[in-house]
From Swiss-Prot:
Keywords: ATP-binding, Cytoplasm, Decarboxylase, Gluconeogenesis, Lyase, Manganese, Metal-binding, Nucleotide-binding. It holds the Pfam family PEPCK_ATP. Substrate binds at residues 59, 201, 207, 328. This is Phosphoenolpyruvate carboxykinase (ATP). ATP binds at residues 207, 226, 243-251, 292, 328, 444-445, 450. Its EC number is 4.1.1.49. Binds 1 Mn(2+) ion per subunit. It comes from Porphyromonas gingivalis (strain ATCC 33277 / DSM 20709 / CIP 103683 / JCM 12257 / NCTC 11834 / 2561). Mn(2+) binds at residues 207, 226, 264. One of its GO terms (biological process) is gluconeogenesis. The gene is pckA.
């Protein structure tokens, strides 16, 4: 048993502490006989274990709170009537009760403690310690965060932040504590502790630390970004891909011709781009070996599937969305062959790609943005929310999520835009808006065409292509690109009647204009209005 002292966190009488367990140990633990309910893992035909997370098959943004105190009162971007977001305040008194529930749940139990890093750059990384009573949750964070070397573990010392996952505890008196439900995902930035109660969804542990990095880094002059990143084989040409869940961040950055830096969360400092994580969390709905070979091949021993349909013999049905559309797999990043080693970081990004899945069928498959349009569309963060990545959303509906990640922004969105643009200007980067959604055919733009577009951006051929302007949005779009169907580049050409596009375009333009009003409270925001759509 580990000599680790958990009493300093209030956790008493642990019957056993399994500190930094190996993958082999975790595999035995999560598949052993006698486990019940959501603790139980099932071995699948691909060698990966599958777990179910119950009613929470996505994050629960309505249950996310920060303790409002002297540390956070003037720094956090709090939700308001004018601009609602997920950063809801809870009192220091309520925090005591919430933390007590977690501590009581974890006391007297056999516990797993996993020490990790968040951030690939030694100068800015954080030491994050996770404490939980469920083996597969320990496996999840071992996959998703950066695994310290033996030597780094020996000198780990005290963590910078502690996460207590107590999925079996629920907040019965949530109303009097000012919470939303029996489930709580609460951060205390003064104590540097996060508590997770009554949800089993793995993504809460991952995204919690993203919210924390999003708090710290911009205050230290770094860009903190909800994006994937890759670089050329010689590691000289880096690109970053912003986009909300389901727009293609993981799929498009996992490219056999390039090296992956990471698939979801990155920082950008004076030296370049660095990953926060040590793993990937890919959506696997309708996954096939043909369409996404790299992700498919990453699903093997030590990968962890979530909410996938598996029969008694271990056979997987990736097409079944009866539990959720948000089926996932987490795997350590080295399950992908082409990665940047030994540290997930590379130089500055010259290509910045905004991915948007437009359910309206209005946006061109690719537009070359001006610097002002870059700020405008980054702050707008448009996509159509795709089915099932959060509870209660199943149809495509338009979403404007600032910086392509409003759910994880702890500071005001303009702070992130400012840091990103500063870095882009420093290296002369260009931004491109890529629509991975639908067009006038009623079908989604093919992954083959989208990959062709990405290739043209990365190899620079888009910058030499002839272009034209698209009305209302004044987007500069190429009229021909190698390997891309020329008939889709102007979205109007995909409609039997171009008037149909015009009608939809006016509607979408109006939505952009209306959404952007919330950024016009200061001169910088007002100045950007001209870069947006005009009716």
């Amino acid at each position: 048993m580990s000599k680790l002292d958990l009493t300093k966190y209030g956790i008493l009488n642990a019957t056993e502490i399994i500190h930094n367990p190996s993958y082999e140990f975790l595999f035995e633990e999560e598949t052993k006989a006698g486990l019940e309910g959501f603790e139980k893992g099932q071995l699948t035909e691909l060698g990966a274990v599958n777990v179910m997370t119950g009613v929470y098959t996505g994050r629960s943004p309505k249950d996310k709170f920060f303790v409002m105190d002297d540390t956070t009162k003037n720094t956090i971007w709090w939700t308001s009537d004018e601009y609602k977001n997920d950063n809801k305040p809870v009192t220091p008194e309520a925090w005591k009760s919430i933390k007590k529930l977690a501590v009581e749940q974890l006391s007297g139990k056999r516990l797993f403690v996993v020490d990790t890093f968040c951030g690939a750059n030694e100068s800015s990384r954080l030491k994050i310690r996770f404490i939980m009573e469920v083996a597969w949750q320990a496996h999840f964070v071992k996959n998703m965060f950066i695994r310290p070397t033996e030597e780094e573990l020996a000198n780990y010392g005290e963590p910078d932040f502690v996460v207590m996952t107590a999925s079996k505890a629920k907040v019965e008196n949530y109303k009097e504590l000012g919470l939303n439900s029996e489930t709580a995902v609460v951060f205390n930035l003064t104590e540097k502790v996060q508590v997770i109660l009554n949800t089993w969804y793995g993504g809460e542990m991952k995204k919690g630390m993203f919210s924390y990095m999003n708090y710290l880094l911009p205050l230290r002059g770094m860009a903190s970004m909800h994006c994937s990143a890759n670089t050329s084989m010689d590691e000289k040409e880096t690109a970053i891909f912003f986009g909300l869940s389901g727009t293609g961040k993981t799929t498009l950055s996992t490219d056999p011709k390039r090296k992956l830096i990471g698939d979801d969360e990155h920082g950008w400092d004076k030296d370049g781009i660095f990953n926060f994580e040590g793993g990937c969390y890919a959506k696997v709905i309708n996954l096939s070996r043909e369409n996404e070979p790299d992700i498919y091949n990453a699903i093997r021993r030590n990968a962890l599937l979530e909410n996938v349909t598996v029969d008694a013999a271990g056979k997987i049905d990736f097409g079944d969305k009866s539990v959720t559309e948000n089926t996932r797999v987490s795997y350590p990043i080295y399950h992908i062959e082409n990665i940047v080693k030994p540290v997930s970081k590379a130089g500055h990004a010259k290509k910045v790609i905004f991915l948007s899945a437009d359910a309206f069928g209005v946006l061109p498959p690719v537009s070359i943005l001006t610097p002002e349009q870059t700020k405008y569309y980054f702050l707008s963060g448009f996509t159509a929310k795709l089915a099932g990545t959060e509870r209660g959303i199943t149809e495509p509906t338009p979403t404007f999520s600032a910086c392509f990640g409003a759910a994880f922004l702890s500071l005001h969105p303009t702070k992130y835009a400012e840091e990103l643009v500063k870095k882009m200007e420093m290296v002369g980067a260009t931004a491109y808006l890529v629509n991975t959604g639908w067009n006038g055919t009623g079908k989604r733009i093919s992954i083959k065409d989208t990959r062709g577009i990405i290739d043209a951006i990365l190899d620079g051929s888009i910058d030499k292509a002839p272009t034209k302007a698209i009305p209302f949005f004044d987007f500069k779009v190429p009229t021909a690109l190698p390997g891309v169907d020329p008939n889709i580049l102007d979205p109007r050409d995909t409609y039997a009647d171009a008037a149909e596009w015009t009608k939809k375009a006016k509607d979408l333009a109006e939505r952009f204009i209306k959404n952007f009003v919330k950024f016009t409270g200061n001169d910088a925001g007002k100045a950007l209005v001209a870069a947006g759509p005009k009716l």
